[in-house]
Amino acid sequence: MAYNITSLMTNFCLITTILSLTLSFKQNSDNNKITKYMRNAFIISLLPLIIYIDQQMDSSSSFTSTFNMISFNLLLGFEADMYCLTFFSIALYITWSIMQFSLWYMHEHNNTLFFKYLTMFLISMLFFLSANNLLQLILGWEGMGIMSFLLINWWHNRLEANSAAMQAIIYNRIGDTGLIIFMIWSALFTNSWNMKQIFILQNNSMDLWLPLLGIVLAATGKSAQFMLHPWLLSAMEGPTPVSALLHSSTMVVSGVFLLIRFYPMIKNSQMIISIILCLGAMTTLFAALCASSQTDIKKIIAFSTTSQLGLMTVTIGINQPQLAFLHMSTHAFFKALLFLCSASIIHTINNEQDIRKMGSLHLILPFTSSCTLISSLALMGMPYLSGFYSKDIILETLNMSYVNAWALLSTMLATALTSIYSTRLILLSMAMTPNINTLIFLKKDKNLFSPLIRLTLGSIIFGFIISTFFLPEKQPNFSIPFNSKILPTIMLILVSSLTLYFMNNHKFSHMPPLFFPSMSGYFPAIFHRLFSYYFLLFPKKVSSSLLDILWYETLGPKSISHNLSSSSSLFNKLSQGTINNYITIFVITILSSLLTSALYF
């Protein structure tokens, strides 16, 4: 009875939360009202979270059968477990902060459509988080893809924004084929799209590599893993609040969340586990290398997102999905804070994004600089900020796990590079000699400072809260020597100190124009230029070299001209009056007549 009441209250609160967000689409809603609706939805979402903390009981509900076939029933419902309830509140909290910040940032474009797009983006994520079946899951999944296209292309009169939005759609369509493959497999072999039923019905005798490879492909596209990552960098063409929401708590983390959701199946395939581990290791190292050589503040933060997503994928690859979710939750706060701080900085220095042209911002923007410092330290894993509670335990578990040395070394090197590019960002933008030309002094506005304060508090204390109340179900082994336990912290301090020393005491030469990390690993040049060139060149050659020649030479006017020329040449020879032609015609005629007479008479 207690379970039924708890389940009823939990699902009622989840439905109420989503329905309260739909008030944003009323015709008389302005931007302030939409932001208040988001705040109210966050407050309502805390109730099921408190119920879960008290009861420690998952809740799964299904409603009336939507599709009824001979052997296939589909029940729509909600999956209210630790993952759903925790990230539900996190996503609402961060979106509320981003929307309030947008009241200041987008004040020159007072358009409620932007806020409604953000609300729809969040509703798609919440629908995805709470889905207990594949139909709801793919509706939320595709909803995020559509809304990301609209938001990235918000400045639709800019060619770069159009191109970035198309990249996001195309790369995600590649990943979406994997999810469709899994849906087809589950319908054929388990006769169900309910995720819990699929987990129960699948057994070790099934060949799971193809459907699980589809899940990995879907996560690779959505979470911008190696090979399908270029769209995330291009997505910086959208407004900075969109980047903050996209990178922190919605679209890009949905791929990692998909792997966490399907871990009960993934753990049965060692091959898929190894693929996930190596994919995450390549992603985190590659993105960290690229971030270390970028000069655009938004691109540095974007590559840092890709690197952290790779770290989450590595964590799933060492069979610790709870730790991956812990890092996903803490990462949401300081990544949203980093983007909002960068938006404030860019707006102040007249839309300049090159960190080499900044400097001494702590004198001009002391509060924003403090928030940037805290978020960067949390990203590095500084004790005792939010990032420390997730990154430290991940690195400890990675050191104690039986993984191949290449994946371990790549992840450790990426962690060191995180300290390098974060320290470089702090120094060049805040502590070096000022190189700023134009300043736009900020007025004191609660819509600017309140979101930064809330996200800063989250970046400081949320890691402690979630690690206290939501301990992993699968506890890693912590019986390691003290020296090994403090190794990540020592490495963080050492690498940051070395970066400080070299940047202050050595003059670095300009990077080569075709330097691998600064060119994003040549991916834009190869995939967007070279492949497109040859892909378009092939049909051009087919049309010009094959079809045109076939028509022109064999069937077309040139062929007709050749045939007429041959015929006229023959008749011309016959009409020249030579005795040889007449004798030949005479002989042929006589022989034909004799042959005909012999055959018929």
From Swiss-Prot:
It catalyses: a ubiquinone + NADH + 5 H(+)(in) = a ubiquinol + NAD(+) + 4 H(+)(out). It is a multi-pass membrane protein. The keyword Electron transport applies. One of its GO terms (cellular component) is mitochondrial inner membrane. The keyword Transmembrane applies. Keywords: Electron transport, Membrane, Mitochondrion, Mitochondrion inner membrane, NAD, Respiratory chain, Translocase, Transmembrane, Transmembrane helix, Transport, Ubiquinone. The chain crosses the membrane at residues 5-25, 37-54, 83-105, 112-129, 134-156, 169-189, 209-231, 240-260, 271-291, 300-320, 323-343, 363-383, 400-420, 451-471, 478-498, 508-528, 581-601. Its main location: mitochondrion. One of its GO terms (molecular function) is NADH dehydrogenase (ubiquinone) activity. GO terms for biological process: ATP synthesis coupled electron transport; electron transport coupled proton transport. It is found in: Mitochondrion inner membrane. Its EC number is 7.1.1.2. Belongs to the complex I subunit 5 family. Core subunit of the mitochondrial membrane respiratory chain NADH dehydrogenase (Complex I) that is believed to belong to the minimal assembly required for catalysis. Complex I functions in the transfer of electrons from NADH to the respiratory chain. The immediate electron acceptor for the enzyme is believed to be ubiquinone. This is NADH-ubiquinone oxidoreductase chain 5. It comes from Myxine glutinosa.
